[in-house]
Design a protein with these regions (language model features):
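N-terminal secretory signal peptides
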Residues: 1-18
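N-terminal twin-arginine translocation
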Residues: 16-22, 33-51, 59
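N-terminal amphipathic alpha-helix/helix-capping segment at the start of soluble metabolic enzymes
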Residues: 57-79
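N-terminal small/glycine-rich loop or linker at the start of catalytic domains
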Residues: 71-89, 142-152
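Structural preference for beta-strand elements that scaffold enzyme active sites
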Residues: 75-79, 112, 138-142, 176-179, ...
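Short, acidic/polar
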Residues: 92-104, 157-170
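Glycine-rich, proline-tolerant flexible connector loops at the mouths of alpha/beta enzymes
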Residues: 115-130
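Beta/alpha (TIM)-barrel catalytic core signal, keyed to glycine-rich beta->alpha loops juxtaposed to Asp/Glu
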Residues: 189-372, 386-391
Length: 391
């Protein structure tokens, strides 16, 4: 159980206007507009996020997809999480349908697509590669390594990384991966060795940018000292605030690292389309293992959804759109990656870029949320064992 009430010594934060998934399951958990600016390459070191206004927020609103930077990688302000198309939120989608959704996202201005070797496993990378091949040079692909899919467990040994990247490149039908994340920090391999292996792959042109998923602030600093980290991917949403409390967001801001929230609509819960009667098949849906998705927690957390619904009515929007707009309003270097296999849900998600939350809106949302309690852990105990705690 997580309480959201502020520390008595800390005043409520005012959000200024942003004028935006055993072992395989553990591995898989990571994570409307038209033209966007061209993608930027380069891996130069940077210190501090400088693409910001004095209060670290940027203008938001309108129907045109804007561009944000993850380190030196320029991407659309909303990305596309491709895991759920192939695995982990029910049976895999029809391949034709999955490709159509990915391509529709690109047509609507999305240039950032997220996958991983473990999703499926392998089938997500294959689907993404096929879907994006016709316009590969107009998009950025993020994928992930870090699990031993034959022996089981974590494996970030440099020689393993340099082997699996070749397989991912083939499945993705490309000669380079724009952003390559360590999926989970391997306690048996120094992060400096991991960063060094990625540095070698960057020199070879096979990887363009380095990322970490579910890493602690300490690990981020150690990795960044060897090879610039472009992005951190961690669960973060209106109801899941760990990155605000554990120093990860602050470290990203200090070091000029972008942040990519996975599960930005609470694995579907914040859409308001599931209630205490929702059930999840343990054979195909990771949420069946999570206490936050038990009938008891689903009912207990409903006030959070009601809060978003009330706000959505005022803004002529949906709860999902408010949740995404809230994330986009936090920092100009945050890029949420909502995922869906449903075309209507895709359009709904992308509609979030037209929702403008004022300073008063953000303060009201924060004040109301601070009176609520989030029930149930974000993942099961066995999944949390693979999350880096920085010790």
């Amino acid at each position: 159980m997580t309480t959201n009430k502020q520390d008595a010594k800390s005043p409520p934060r005012v959000r200024r206007p942003l004028s935006r998934r055993d072992f395989l399951a553990s591995a898989a958990l990571v994570g409307a507009g038209l033209a966007v600016s061209p993608l930027l390459g380069g891996c130069a070191d940077q210190s501090k996020n400088t693409d910001k206004t004095s209060d670290n927020r940027v203008a938001r609103g309108g129907n045109r997809m804007k561009t944000r930077k993850l380190g030196q990688l320029a991407v659309s302000e909303l990305g596309s999480g491709c895991m759920s198309i192939s695995a982990n939120y029910g049976p895999p989608a029809d391949r034709t349908q999955g490709i159509a959704v990915i391509r529709a996202a690109h047509e609507r201005g999305v240039t950032f697509f997220d996958t991983a070797e473990v999703y499926g496993p392998f089938t997500s990378e294959e689907l993404v590669g096929e879907a994006l091949e016709p316009f590969r040079d107009k998009v950025a692909i993020a994928s992930k390594f870090g699990f031993d899919l034959e022996a089981g467990g974590l494996n970030s040994r440099p020689e393993h990384i340099k082997t699996v990247v070749e397989d991912s490149l083939k499945r993705l039908r490309t000669d380079r991966i724009d952003l390559y994340y360590q999926h989970r920090v391997d306690p048996n391999v120094p992060i400096e060795d991991v960063a060094g292996a990625i540095r070698d792959l960057i020199k070879e042109g096979k990887i363009l940018h380095f990322g970490l998923s579910e890493a602690s602030a300490t690990t981020i600093r150690r990795a960044h000292a060897v090879q610039s980290v472009a992005a951190i991917q961690t669960e973060y949403s209106f109801m899941e605030r760990d990155p605000e409390r554990n120093g990860v967001l602050a470290t990203c801001e200090e070091l000029g690292i972008g942040f990519v929230p996975w599960a930005p609509v609470g694995m579907g819960y914040l859409t308001g389309k599931m209630d205490a009667h929702a059930r999840f098949d343990p054979k195909t849906d990771l949420r069946a293992e999570f206490d936050r998705f038990s009938p008891k927690s689903l009912a207990a957390n409903w006030p959070i959804v009601e809060l978003l619904k009330r706000f959505a009515e005022k803004k002529n929007a949906t709860p999902a759109q408010i949740a995404l707009a809230w994330l986009l309003a936090q920092k100009p270097w945050i890029v949420p990656i909502p995922g869906t296999r449903n075309m209507d849900h895709l359009n709904e998600n992308l509609g979030a870029i037209a929702v403008e939350l004022t300073a008063a809106d953000l303060e009201e949302l924060e004040t109301d949320f601070s009176t609520l309690t989030v029930h149930g852990g974000r993942m099961s105990a066995k999944h949390m064992r693979d999350v880096d705690q920085g010790v």
